[in-house]
């Protein structure tokens, strides 16, 4: 019996010891693997090496101590893992480094991590962790040096408890949803060197206690935050500060003079704020400063003389302020200056003549000022100058010959000045040149194009000068040119057939010159042409039949020449041609009346005495003869008068009958307010089910047409219910209701939101749509998780939305104009497939070419086509413009308005930054796109710029947009031409060390 009791006692002790024994590190790692989806045992799994049969010290991402018994480092960064972080990670007792960055791990941060008392580095950045930051971490991780939770979904106030981490040197809390104020206790870390709270939703004042961080080297507080007031004077106490980024966070007032104490500062970014007053003199005492961006503020006054002491300055951005006075001569003496951007101010006087003599100048933009004088002669003395922009000033004199030898030059924009003399020889042969804009000057001489030209040149604009001589055949060597604008000059001689070699050409304008001879039929080889203007020349001969080979041509102007012969009837088949002008030539014969000719105005054919047809008079050969040409034009006969009287009487009776019927129907309607469901397909719910959704908590959107609710039907299906604004009885348009019902009720297309049915009680109308769980493109793209929307997904959305609009424009009869195309009206389903939505403003396009209600709204701000301002008319080309804005949003990641200064939208900004040159797309590319197929992005950008052309006739149709997007070039990877290129890191964003955010399709 005693032996039995002894055995029971030993068994109990053994069980107790086993139950209390901590989980082994081996099992902790297996638990971690189980919690992370995408980490299975298949060979393609990123954690496929984590097998029971092998030592965990050999597993990927695992580092052990010398005894190979304990894990000291776990680095699973960038493995595309999802799921949650298992609390069992806390059993890796000797862990010093934990990095799970650049994955898709969600859920809360487990507070159990606090038991890892030896942890020094914790990096959870670029995931989708949510909830509040656990305070337990701050009490347990006493040895923590690095804490990085950048770019997650963490909420609540900024954690105060992290100030207990006295060993902390690097803290990155940016890119989350933290709210509230920066706590004053954030000034108490004794050894911190890096602090980032940028990209949150912080408010209030910047606490003066921040000045106590005397060891701080980098401080990032900008972007999405909206602070009150300006910088506290205590900022000057940060004696070790090297980088300070306070851009775009609502700062006001003047820059405090105490900033001059920051003698180690090399980077100062305060752009896109509301700073005012003069530029602080003490800025010139920052002897270590290399980059200073104070652009997009409201600074006044002149550039301080103290700036002459900034001998290390490489970047000076003061554009978009209210500065005046002369540009000081010492700017040209700064020995390290590489970037100088002073555009959109009120600077006067001349450009410093020594500018560029330091041999390091890379970018100069002095446009939109009031500068006079001549151009500095040695701006490219170091052969590093890439961009030179001086447009919109009062500069005179010649263009320096040295620019014709500047092999580094990629863009030159000197339009809208008073420059004279000839274009420097060699300019068009520069190997990297992509854009030349010299329009609206007084340049003379011949076009200096020899055998060797720049094949990269995408745009040549020489309009409105005094250039003369023949157009050299070597112009055909500009194989990459997209826009060739030579209008308003004195060019003469024939148009060379070599123009047909310009396969990338989309716009050609040779109007207002002295060109003679026939129209070169070879021009038809330029398949991408959308705009051709050869008007006001001395051209002769016949219109070539080959012109019909240009399948996407929108605009063709051959007016005021000496063309003869008949108009080719084959032009009638050019469906894309929307504007044509053959007036004031010597054409003859009958104007075709079929196909596209039925859309052209008769004024397009005036001034051709031998042309005949409608409005032009009868043809000489008697084609128009018949027995219906002679009608009495005298006074009306008695019988005709009687018929008119009887007609009026009948109409009066008819109106009376209609009025009686209408009155009875209104009375009947007022007696019955029952809800009625009209279904466009089989539905498993009733109006009562729909009405149950109309609760405040279910609101998911509000717009001009009404409120949208999320509804759950009895069978579990999700729907979106749009409650339209109350309408007055008898309203002919019912606030968009009739238009939506007539269009959506019969539309079935994969990329258009499906209308399931509608409920009505004669006073209120409810539209029931299929539900789109991922919301709108605008919400996703412009939210803080827009970086997760990778390029492949963006391109897919662009093509799908284009197909939806194409269906409305080309496959509906009559065609449908959306009128409010925008990123918020492109909805995304669970697979991020795009669906065009919101037809509350859609109208049928009548045969007349105008919409049925021109007083209706024509779209949303930032998306409205420019012609609406003076025509008040909307057509399908207005939708094309709006879609082009959406494409620019996808490429740049920016909203259409609100980010570029007063009165500037995304189209104007992109044109300013790239000069509409597709090869400059990297200058505006969304910095959140870390790795992209550059040829695809360039092509989509090219399509976007076609869509937002100023003139509607120059825009492609949506069918052409789909075709061009579908035929996007696919370049094979090679050693010389990589498939992907890294997007340049934004100067405005702090470096986070993060390169590839996850794709939303994998969420």
From Swiss-Prot:
Pfam families: LRR_1 (PF00560), LRR_14 (PF23598), LRRNT_2 (PF08263), Pkinase (PF00069)
GO MF, one annotated term: protein serine/threonine kinase activity
Glycan-carrying positions: 80, 97, 123, 130, 153, 164, 212, 237, 312, 346, 420, 477, 557, 586, 601
Record-listed E.C. numbers: 2.7.11.1
Chain residues that bind ATP: 700-708, 722
SMART domains: LRR_TYP, S_TKc
Predominant localisation class: membrane
Catalytic activity field: L-seryl-[protein] + ATP = O-phospho-L-seryl-[protein] + ADP + H(+); L-threonyl-[protein] + ATP = O-phospho-L-threonyl-[protein] + ADP + H(+)
Source domain of life: Eukaryota
Stated family: Belongs to the protein kinase superfamily. Ser/Thr protein kinase family.
Name of the featured protein: Leucine-rich repeat receptor-like serine/threonine-protein kinase BAM1
Native source organism of the sequence: Arabidopsis thaliana
Upper taxonomic lineage: Eukaryota, Viridiplantae, Streptophyta, Embryophyta, Tracheophyta
């Amino acid at each position: 019996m005693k032996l039995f009791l002894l055995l029971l006692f030993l068994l109990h002790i053994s069980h107790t010891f086993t139950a209390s024994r901590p989980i082994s590190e081996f099992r902790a790692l297996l638990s971690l693997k189980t919690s992370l989806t995408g980490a299975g045992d298949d060979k393609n799994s990123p954690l496929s090496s984590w097998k029971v049969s092998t030592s965990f010290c050999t597993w990927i991402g695992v580092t052990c101590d010398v005894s190979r018994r304990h894990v000291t480092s776990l680095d699973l960064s960038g493995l595309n893992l999802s799921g949650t972080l298992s609390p069992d990670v806390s059993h890796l007792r000797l862990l010093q480094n934990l990095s799970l960055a650049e994955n898709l791990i969600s859920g809360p941060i487990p507070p159990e991590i606090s038991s890892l008392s030896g942890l020094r580095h914790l990096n959870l950045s670029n995931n989708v962790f949510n909830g509040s930051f656990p305070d337990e971490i701050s009490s347990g991780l006493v040895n923590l040096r690095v804490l990085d939770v950048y770019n997650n979904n963490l909420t609540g106030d900024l954690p105060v408890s992290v100030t207990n981490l006295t060993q902390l040197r690097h803290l990155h809390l940016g890119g989350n949803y933290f709210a509230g104020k920066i706590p004053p206790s954030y000034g108490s870390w004794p050894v911190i060197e890096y602090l980032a709270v940028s990209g949150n939703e912080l408010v209030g004042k910047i606490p003066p206690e921040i000045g106590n961080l005397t060891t701080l080297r980098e401080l990032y507080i900008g972007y999405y935050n909206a602070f009150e007031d300006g910088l506290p004077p205590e900022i000057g106490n940060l004696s070790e500060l090297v980088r300070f980024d306070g851009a775009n966070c609502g700062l006001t007032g003047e820059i405090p003079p105490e900033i001059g104490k920051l003698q180690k500062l090399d980077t100062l970014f305060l752009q896109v704020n509301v700073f005012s007053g003069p530029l602080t003199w003490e800025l010139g005492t920052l002897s270590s400063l290399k980059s200073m961006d104070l652009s997009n503020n409201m600074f006044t006054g002149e550039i301080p003389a103290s700036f002459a002491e900034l001998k290390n300055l490489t970047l000076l951005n003061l554009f978009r302020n209210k500065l005046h006075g002369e540009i000081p001569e010492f700017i040209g003496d700064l020995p390290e200056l590489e970037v100088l951007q002073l555009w959109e101010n009120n600077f006067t006087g001349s450009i410093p003549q020594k500018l560029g003599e330091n041999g390091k100048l890379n970018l100069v933009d002095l446009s939109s000022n009031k500068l006079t004088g001549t151009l500095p002669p040695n701006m490219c003395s170091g052969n590093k100058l890439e961009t030179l922009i001086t447009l919109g000033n009062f500069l005179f004199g010649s263009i320096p010959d040295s620019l014709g030898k500047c092999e580094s030059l990629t863009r030159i924009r000197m339009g809208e000045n008073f420059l004279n003399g000839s274009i420097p020889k060699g300019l068009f042969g520069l190997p990297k040149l992509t854009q030349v804009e010299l329009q609206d000057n007084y340049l003379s001489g011949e076009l200096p194009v020899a055998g060797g030209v720049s094949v990269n040149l995408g745009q040549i604009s020489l309009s409105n000068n005094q250039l003369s001589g023949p157009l050299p055949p070597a112009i055909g060597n500009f194989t990459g040119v997209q826009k060739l604008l030579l209008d308003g000059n004195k060019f003469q001689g024939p148009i060379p057939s070599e123009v047909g070699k310009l396969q990338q050409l989309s716009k050609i304008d040779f109007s207002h010159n002295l060109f003679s001879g026939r129209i070169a039929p070879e021009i038809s080889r330029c398949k991408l042409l959308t705009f051709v203007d050869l008007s006001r020349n001395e051209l002769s001969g016949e219109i070539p039949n080959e012109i019909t080979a240009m399948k996407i041509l929108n605009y063709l102007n051959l007016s005021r020449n000496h063309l003869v012969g008949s108009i080719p009837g084959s032009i009638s088949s050019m469906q894309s041609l929307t504007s044509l002008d053959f007036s004031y030539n010597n054409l003859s014969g009958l104007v075709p009346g079929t196909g596209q000719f039925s859309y052209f105005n008769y004024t397009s054919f005036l001034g051709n005495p031998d042309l005949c047809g409608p409005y032009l008079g009868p043809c000489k050969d008697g084609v128009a003869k018949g027995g219906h040409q002679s009608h009495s034009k005298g006074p009306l006969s008695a019988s005709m008068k009687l018929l008119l009287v009887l007609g009026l009487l009948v109409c009066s009776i008819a109106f009376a009958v209609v009025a009686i019927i209408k009155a009875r129907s209104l009375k009947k309607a007022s007696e019955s307010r029952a809800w009625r469901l009209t279904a466009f397909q089989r539905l498993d719910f009733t109006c009562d089910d729909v009405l149950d959704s109309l609760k405040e908590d279910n609101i998911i959107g509000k717009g001009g047409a009404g409120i949208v609710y999320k509804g759950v039907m009895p069978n579990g299906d999700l729907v979106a219910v749009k409650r339209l604004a109350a309408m007055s009885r008898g309203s002919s348009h019912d606030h968009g209701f009739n238009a939506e019902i007539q269009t959506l009720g019969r539309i079935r297309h994969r990329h258009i939101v499906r209308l399931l049915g509608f409920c009505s009680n004669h006073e209120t109308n409810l539209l029931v749509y299929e539900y789109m769980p991922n919301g709108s493109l605008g919400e996703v793209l412009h939210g803080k998780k827009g970086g997760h929307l990778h390029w492949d997904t963006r391109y897919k959305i662009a093509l799908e939305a284009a197909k939806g609009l194409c269906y409305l424009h080309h496959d509906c009869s009559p065609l449908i104009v959306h009128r409010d195309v925008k990123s918020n009206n492109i909805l995304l389903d669970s697979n991020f497939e795009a669906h065009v939505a919101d037809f509350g403003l859609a109208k049928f396009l009548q045969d007349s070419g105008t919409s049925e209600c021109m007083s209706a709204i024509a779209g949303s701000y930032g998306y409205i086509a420019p012609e609406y301002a003076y025509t008040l008319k909307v057509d399908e080309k207005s939708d094309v413009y709006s879609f082009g804005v959406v494409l620019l949003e996808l490429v740049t990641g920016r909203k259409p308005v609100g980010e570029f200064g007063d009165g500037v939208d995304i189209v104007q900004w992109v044109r300013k930054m790239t000069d509409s040159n597709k090869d400059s797309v990297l200058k505006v590319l969304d910095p959140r796109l870390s790795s992209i197929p550059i040829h695809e992005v360039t092509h989509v950008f090219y399509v976007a710029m076609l869509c937002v052309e100023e003139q509607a006739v120059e825009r492609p149709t949506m069918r052409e947009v789909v075709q061009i997007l579908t035929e996007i070039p696919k370049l094979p990877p090679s050693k010389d031409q990589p498939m992907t290129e890294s997007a340049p890191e934004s100067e405005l964003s702090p470096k986070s060390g993060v390169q590839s955010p996850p794709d939303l399709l994998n969420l």
